[in-house]
């Protein structure tokens, strides 16, 4: 455990994570200073009186005088103020690094462009099914520091590339990079390989690395080694097996579960289940209780979630698809009896949308594109696309056209912040309108 006594600590970014960092230091007899670029950041009213704060920008004087800066994942390490502090020899970490220095029990660490939250939650459910005292959080749910507890037996953390950039003490019992597709390119000026390098940090010092046999970018830099266990659709130690119209989860040649026993649907969710099972096995959770958890887990909100089924039409809320890879995952292997009405749009974060083109073929698909990058998305296949300003306009446009057997799918391939507070609000609006229009 690290000693922070007499250290000049500055925390950048409030919110729940920033407050968890403040509490962490106060509990150790250190009073940090806090700054946030927002004028009224969330959590400001909960900040103890004795904690100095600076809002509406960064305070370079504080940063240069610090011994330790705890930076929110929301601020780029390339920010001039942080670069100057780093050049002056100031140590810069994130809340995950603080957590890793304290945690005594095994950590399962999960990153990837898509599927992180589902796999993290699933491994947590598998641990609970085995009666293990588990802390689940990180980039989902509770901040990592709020999970620290002497009674814990296991931690399961979802980690973003931003969090991994400031983490060097992670020694995961099992770690995975589920997949690597373009995301956050606005934060990675050197492109996909720079983003991938941040993700791959999760494997450093890991006991077991769970890699995706279908995605070479998830392999450790030096290639697969004896630490690696693989999952994939048709290949890998954990893979899918299709026989006589049935699909099974299979481990090293042995069928372990028929997917019809699972509440989750879709090929991407079956591979998520394989990854979760590989991680659970790697930390010694009993296979029987892990499989039981797979049969009861209903999935997470806004992730290929059935919002409404009415008059033979399914309305699917996949608002969490905030990047191209996530929408590809939703469309890959998707079966629709009638026409697919696909809602795309929002802020594309400088991504290349062209990988979607291969899924937009045939005459049983219609595109409804909205938001900041709607025009770019409509240009993928203009003859079947209609562009509107908002998602609501798009939904009112498509509603009279749907027939029994059709599917209306919100899988926007974009962030939501151009028109919504977050992807959850976008999904909630979709669900409300589906119930009104369907």
UniProtKB/Swiss-Prot annotation:
Keyword Cell cycle: yes
Keywords annotated in UniProt: ATP-binding, Cell cycle, Cell division, Cell shape, Cell wall biogenesis/degradation, Cytoplasm, Ligase, Nucleotide-binding, Peptidoglycan synthesis
Pathway assigned in UniProt: Cell wall biogenesis; peptidoglycan biosynthesis
Positions contributing to ATP binding: 112-118
Gene3D superfamilies from the UniProt entry: Mur ligase, C-terminal domain (3.90.190.20), Mur-like, catalytic domain (3.40.1190.10), NAD(P)-binding Rossmann-like Domain (3.40.50.720)
Catalytic activity, as annotated: UDP-N-acetyl-alpha-D-muramoyl-L-alanine + D-glutamate + ATP = UDP-N-acetyl-alpha-D-muramoyl-L-alanyl-D-glutamate + ADP + phosphate + H(+)
GO cellular component entries: cytoplasm
Residues spanning the membrane: none
Gene Ontology molecular function terms on file: ATP binding; UDP-N-acetylmuramoylalanine-D-glutamate ligase activity
Pfam families, sorted: Mur_ligase_C (PF02875), Mur_ligase_M (PF08245), MurD-like_N (PF21799)
Subcellular location: Cytoplasm
GO BP field: cell division; cell wall organization; peptidoglycan biosynthetic process; regulation of cell shape
EC number: 6.3.2.9
Keyword Glycoprotein: no
HAMAP family xref list: MurD
Family: Belongs to the MurCDEF family.
Protein name per the record: UDP-N-acetylmuramoylalanine--D-glutamate ligase
Gene: murD
């Amino acid at each position: 455990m690290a000693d922070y006594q007499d250290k000049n600590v500055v925390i950048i970014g409030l919110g729940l994570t920033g407050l968890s960092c403040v509490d962490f230091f106060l509990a150790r007899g250190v009073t940090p200073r806090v700054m946030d670029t927002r004028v009224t950041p969330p959590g400001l009213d909960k900040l103890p009186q004795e904690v100095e704060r600076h809002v509406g920008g960064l305070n370079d004087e504080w940063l240069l005088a610090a011994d330790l800066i705890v930076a929110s994942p929301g601020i780029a390490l390339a920010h001039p103020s942080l670069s100057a502090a780093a050049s002056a020899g100031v140590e810069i970490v994130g809340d995950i690094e603080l957590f890793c220095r304290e945690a005594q029990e095994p950590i399962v660490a999960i990153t990837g462009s898509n599927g992180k939250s589902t796999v993290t939650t699933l491994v947590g459910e598998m641990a609970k099914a085995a009666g293990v005292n588990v802390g689940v959080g990180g980039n989902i749910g509770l901040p990592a520091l709020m999970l620290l507890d002497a009674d814990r037996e296991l931690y399961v953390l979802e980690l973003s590339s931003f969090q991994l950039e400031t983490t060097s003490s992670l020694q995961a019992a099992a770690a995975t990079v589920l997949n690597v597709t373009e995301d956050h390119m606005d934060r990675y000026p050197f492109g996909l390989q720079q983003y991938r390098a941040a993700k791959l940090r999760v494997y450093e010092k890991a006991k077991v690395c769970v890699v995706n046999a279908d995605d070479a970018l998830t392999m450790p830099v030096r290639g697969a080694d004896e630490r690696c266990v693989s999952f994939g659709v048709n290949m890998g130690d954990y893979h899918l097996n299709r026989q006589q119209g049935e699909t099974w989860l299979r481990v090293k040649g042995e069928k372990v579960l028929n997917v019809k026993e699972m509440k989750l649907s879709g090929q991407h969710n079956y591979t998520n289940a394989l990854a979760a099972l590989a991680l659970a096995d790697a930390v010694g959770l009993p296979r029987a209780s892990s499989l039981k958890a797979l049969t009861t887990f209903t999935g997470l909100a806004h992730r290929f979630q059935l919002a409404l089924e009415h008059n033979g039409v399914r309305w699917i809320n996949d608002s969490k698809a905030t990047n191209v890879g996530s929408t590809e995952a939703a469309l890959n292997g998707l079966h629709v009896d009638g026409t697919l009405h696909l809602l795309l749009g929002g802020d594309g974060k400088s991504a290349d949308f062209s990988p979607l083109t291969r899924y937009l073929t045939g005459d049983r698909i219609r595109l409804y594109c909205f938001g900041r990058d709607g025009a770019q998305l409509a240009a993928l296949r203009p003859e079947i696309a209609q562009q509107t300003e908002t998602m609501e306009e798009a939904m009112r446009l498509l509603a009279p056209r749907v027939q029994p057997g059709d599917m209306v799918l919100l899988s926007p391939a974009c962030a939501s912040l151009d028109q919504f507070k977050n992807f959850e609000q976008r999904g909630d609006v979709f669900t409300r309108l589906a119930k009104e229009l369907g």
